[in-house]
């Protein structure tokens, strides 16, 4: 079995390889937003590392010891090229209608709640699958930059 990476390792990779980020930590959720020069109030979502289940987000079973989920968002075209058509939005408290075990470890999959918005995730990535997920982080970063530029023009 491959070595699973730590949250610290992944955070260090993100902070070292993606510039212009703002980091926020709340309720065991490490969130990164693109906000070059802090022009926007909160910035634009880039990626999240979540360590626990939420009221409406239990499908990943993150309350297991040492389990976390790395998530990011892809633009529509990248998402469709990689995963096909987006599922419909889930009802509050439910997960998207997909044939996944969202609690699986080290498997790149659609996000159990936000797949309809283009989010993907992996629980406890191994070094091998993190290398693959890095490409998705880059796509998410480029999406965040593009969205940021649109928003600052509108100011």
Regions found by a protein language model. Name each.
Residues 1-155:
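Charge-dense, helix-prone N-terminal extensions
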